[in-house]
Regions:
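Active-site-proximal segments of metal-dependent phosphoesterases and phosphodiesterases across multiple
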Residues: 137-147, 151-191
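An acidic, phosphate/nucleotide-engaging active-site surface
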Residues: 96-147
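N-terminal active-site segment of His-dependent metallophosphoesterases
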Residues: 1-65, 69, 78, 144-156
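Beta-strand-turn-beta hairpins that frame and shape the catalytic cleft
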Residues: 1-2, 9, 122-132, 153-158, ...
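Active-site neighborhood of divalent metal-dependent phosphoester/pyrophosphate hydrolases
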Residues: 7-12, 43-61, 80-96, 157, ...
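Active-site neighborhood of phospho(di)ester-bond hydrolases with catalytic His/Asp-centered motifs
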Residues: 4-5, 45-51, 81-88, 116-120, ...
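Metal-dependent catalytic neighborhoods of phosphoester/phosphodiester hydrolases
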Residues: 15, 50-70, 86-110, 171, ...
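Conserved beta-sheet core of the metallophosphoesterase superfamily
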Residues: 171-228
Length: 228
């Protein structure tokens, strides 16, 4: 299984930019995304672990370009699965709004049999040992889900999620969820590895108290630099 995350397609930076530099950034991000998809061709299943797009609603031109690239991947990789996991950019406080990610996920799932969607507040277990956890609407719901996933985990399992790790500033911010060191320790003591998207800087952490044969916390970082 190959994991990419935080691609932030349709990124739009205003401060200190010009129309041309914004267009250049847009083209760069899509070119890099295309390269990432090419690398994964016919290699393995692909997980996009949140924040496919930079915003809740994106420019239709960018949506169509993302659709073109993803449909090509799904058609060419018919024996592999594309897992689309919702991130924090894919939800809104208004329940009647549908995000660009949700539209993309629904269209691709309806068109291809090898697409699976893990929407807001949802989880899915792949291959029996990989637990995918999407963004949740608030920290309380997220904590409840983590507790349930912990019960289901066995040694050697992986939990893929879109959240901060041990970030005190995010603990009370529902738009940016947090896994505390204490929560992570319960997983690593069981020999489970947590793989985080959302944080843009890569790092590997071992929660204090983890046994020598325990798991770890891996923050992937984003593969296409668009911001810190």
């Amino acid at each position: 299984m190959i994991i990419i995350s935080d691609t932030h397609l349709s990124v739009n930076r205003v401060s200190g930019t010009t129309p041309q530099s914004r267009e250049d950034l847009r083209n760069y991000v899509f070119a890099e995304f295309d390269k990432l998809l090419d690398i994964t061709d016919n290699n393995d299943d692909l997980v996009i672990l949140g924040d496919l797009f930079d915003g809740f609603e994106v420019d239709p031109r960018d949506w169509l370009e993302a659709y073109r690239l993803l449909t090509a991947w799904c058609a060419y990789n018919s024996f592999h699965t594309l897992y689309l996991v919702a991130g924090n950019h894919d939800t809104s406080a208004k329940a009647n709004r549908v995000s660009s990610f949700e539209t993309m996920a629904a269209v691709l799932k309806g068109q291809f049999r090898n697409v699976k969607v893990i929407g807001i507040d949802e989880t899915l277990t792949a291959d029996g040992y990989i637990h995918l956890v999407a963004h949740h609407r608030n920290q309380e719901l997220f904590d409840l889900t983590l507790a349930k996933v912990l019960e289901d985990c066995e040694r050697g399992d992986y939990v893929l999620l879109h959240a901060n790790y041990d970030n005190k500033f995010a603990e009370q911010a529902d738009h940016s969820l947090n896994v505390s060191e204490a929560q992570a320790l319960e997983f690593t003591k069981k020999g489970v590895t947590l793989i985080h998207a959302h944080e843009h800087q890569p790092r590997v952490e071992i929660p204090h108290g983890t046994p020598a044969d325990g798991g770890s916390v891996v923050c992937l970082g984003n593969q296409i630099p668009t911001s810190v």
